[in-house]
Amino acid sequence: MRPHCLPVFLFCMSLYTATVYSQIPFYTDDADTTPKRQFHLEMYNEHDVLQKSAYPVKRQNTLVFTLNYGLTKNLELGVNAPFITLINSRIVESGAVGGQGDMQFGMKYKLRAERDGSKLPAFAIVFYAEAPTGSTRKELGSGLTDYWLYGIAQKSLTKRTTARVNGGVLFSGNSSTGLIGIRTERGHVYTGNASLVRSFSNKLNLGAEVFGAVTSNFILDRGQLTGQIGAQYALTNKVTLTFGVLGGRFNASPRAGVHLGFSYN
């Protein structure tokens, strides 16, 4: 598509009735799975200002491609590939280094759908394995194979408001993506996420979340705690734009960041 045709294409597509269908920008996973024999694509860019402990690296840019496929009605397969750029202080000769990060391969199984009249939430379970495809010399990868298992609970509080909670454990490896996340080689890492998202129309969702991680020895200043405010806007029934602003505490979290992405069904 020619560059000058893109704005016209997006405008025309936005004239159609659209409904939001996207997880990003939120890190809190949902209990839904991709419909059987269909693909779901997500791509986003997150630019973060790092904690002072990461110096001389000052900022990190992470471009992530995620592709999901509905194998059955309740089973989804996924692959996640990040491209990471680390921006250094001026005291470092190489101003920036970049390359592929560690790739993730996962599956999600929906155990229970939410039902009208029931107080029980929807439940799903997710397993991810992360391959050490990123360069450890450039600090783009952990050099470890990660195994992560977590559960999802999702409940509609009203017709327009949905709460989601995730909780899990990394049995091996660590939670780092580039210089963000817990970088440990031994012991377990416990993770937790919670989000509240409200639908203001068929096109617009707004929400907030908090997510974090801590090692098995519970040293908080080496942990991760991040909050995010995000939005999802459906251009069409297939294309959703996403935006988020986030900030965090402790060494494993970014000080501040901004997210911009889209999803396609």
Kindly label every feature range from the protein language model:
Residues 10-14:
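Gram-negative bacterial Sec-dependent N-terminal signal peptides
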Residues 21-265:
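Transmembrane beta-barrel domains of Gram-negative outer membranes and organellar outer membranes
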Residues 1-9:
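Bacterial N-terminal signal peptides that target proteins for export
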